[in-house]
């Protein structure tokens, strides 16, 4: 039988851990993996290690690009950082605490995740999909800014004109931009973006990375999975090269994106050179 003495304790179960996050100081690590091991089983065979003792961190105010060949573990690492996979060993910390410390609501207020695929089971409009990014802030003072943040996110992702369109009727690129707007509207200190440029044309690819750079300049921590090494060189503060589930190199683009390393990791001859006019770093496959 419950008594009045139980009520404060029961109430704390519903409120514990739901404090609103504060903006991290520039340079403060928001997300860290230590000794991360992720395994997957296929059928009755032994487990396959897809991440092997990975150490990784991202700090407020920087963009870190995850690059590497297909199957290297980029998306798996992003999913583990997001708390969507249970590691076999090691762990992930968000804002200084293990992911298990946070409720799903608390994590949604601290990091936003853009997956590779964008599916919605009902014919919500594009604006309604973007508004889903504000769900973690319901019944908080930050909900007062919902309309402004939704409008700003849609403008930034160039989807304002799609506001009334049903999400399932949009093209692949339009769906990707609406999904990005949802992540922007969520307004979290950490952004995890899995191949945000994959379905986009050249102009929108550049626009998306400029948005990520703007968020980092404003103090967000951004992790982005990319296949285009030239875009990674142009926009990332750091590049982590994954190879067979391990981090082969992690550092500034010019230190990491070298001919020798990329040729070895991608198992194809690669040429790294500077643009003759702008000096920008270019990464090109060697073609006969």
Swiss-Prot record:
What's its membrane topology? Answer: Peripheral membrane protein
The answer to keyword Transport applying to this record is yes
Record's Gene Ontology CC terms? plasma membrane
**What keyword terms does UniProt attach to this protein?**
ATP-binding, Cell membrane, Membrane, Nucleotide-binding, Translocase, Transport
Binding annotation for ATP: 68-75
Q: Give the Enzyme Commission number.
A: 7.6.2.-
Q: What is its main location?
A: membrane
Q: Where in the cell is it found?
A: Cell membrane
- CDD domains attached here? ABC_Iron-Siderophores_B12_Hemin (cd03214)
Which GO MF terms are attached to this record?
ATP binding; ATP hydrolysis activity
> PANTHER family, per this entry?
HEMIN IMPORT ATP-BINDING PROTEIN HMUV (PTHR42794:SF1)
Self-association state and partner proteins as the record states? The complex is composed of two ATP-binding proteins (HmuV), two transmembrane proteins (HmuU) and a solute-binding protein (HmuT).
Job description of the protein:
Part of the ABC transporter complex HmuTUV involved in hemin import. Responsible for energy coupling to the transport system.
Q: Indicate the family of this protein.
A: Belongs to the ABC transporter superfamily. Heme (hemin) importer (TC 3.A.1.14.5) family.
Protein name in the entry: Hemin import ATP-binding protein HmuV
Q: Which organism is it from?
A: Nocardia farcinica (strain IFM 10152)
